[in-house]
């Protein structure tokens, strides 16, 4: 599910490497670069890719720190990267100079990160196990007006409080919550499933059922994020915000 993934992984890379986001470019998924990626599904995009990007960036940062420590004769743990500058007890170097120096000294400047969700197991027969790493919570109150004679309805106001853990990007997450609500409203009010006498689904595309549009958004629409650190080890203690708002 779309969650502003490119922006979020760019934020993760920027934060881990200590460089401005303007220096980060995320490329589209391409099997020529990463042949075995997981599907963009189950609201797992930010969790999986964010942790993988963080792992890859930590690998790169360790290589660069090791190189700088040897070059400047200082302890590895005293080297920091912040705002595009590498600093140590006796030096400061812009990021571009660090990269050039590493390249000239034949330090590998590429890395792969991998992450899989831990602690997941489920026995279908026994109905036991842990199918999910964590749960996302939310509460909403919606005011609607309904014509009791025709059934015509309109959403007047909606107030939502949604649990995103420690949000990676509040603007993106609020937009996702808003979109999930409108999508869910359409699912419950206009997207009817109709089969013919032979069991063939007739309402199989937007051409055969009505989906909500921008005008179906409530005029008063208040969304707040419940800033509650995820107790699980997710990327910066955030939570998925793909399908949870829809439900």
List each model region and its residues.
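Conserved beta-alpha junction segments in alpha/beta enzyme cores
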Residues: 1-3, 134
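Conserved strand-to-helix beginnings and helix N-cap segments that scaffold or border functional pockets
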Residues: 6-7
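C-terminal catalytic domains of large/alpha subunits in multi-subunit enzymes
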Residues: 11-247
């Amino acid at each position: 599910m779309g969650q502003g993934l490119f922006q979020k992984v760019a934020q993760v890379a920027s934060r881990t490497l200590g460089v401005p986001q303007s220096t980060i470019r995320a490329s589209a998924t391409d099997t020529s670069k990463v042949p075995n990626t997981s599907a963009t599904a189950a609201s797992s995009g930010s969790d999986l890719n964010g942790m993988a990007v963080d792992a890859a960036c930590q690998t790169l940062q360790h290589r660069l720190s090791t190189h700088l420590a040897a070059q400047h004769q200082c302890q590895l743990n005293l080297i920091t990267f912040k705002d595009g500058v590498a600093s140590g007890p006796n030096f400061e170097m812009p990021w571009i100079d660090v990269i050039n120096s590493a390249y000239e000294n034949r330090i590998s400047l590429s890395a792969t990160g991998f992450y899989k969700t831990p602690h997941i197991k489920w026995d279908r027969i026994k109905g036991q196990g842990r199918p999910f790493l964590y749960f996302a919570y939310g509460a909403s109150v919606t005011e609607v007006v309904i014509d009791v004679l025709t059934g015509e309805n309109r959403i007047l106001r909606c107030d939502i409080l949604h649990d995103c853990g420690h949000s990676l990007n509040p603007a993106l997450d609020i937009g996702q919550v808003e979109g999930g609500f409108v999508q869910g409203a359409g699912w419950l009010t206009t997207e009817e499933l109709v089969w013919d006498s032979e069991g063939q689904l007739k309402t199989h595309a937007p051409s055969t059922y009505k989906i909500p549009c921008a005008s179906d958004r409530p005029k008063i629409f208040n969304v707040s994020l419940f800033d509650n650190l995820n107790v699980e080890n997710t990327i910066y203690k955030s939570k998925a915000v793909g399908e949870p708002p829809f439900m």
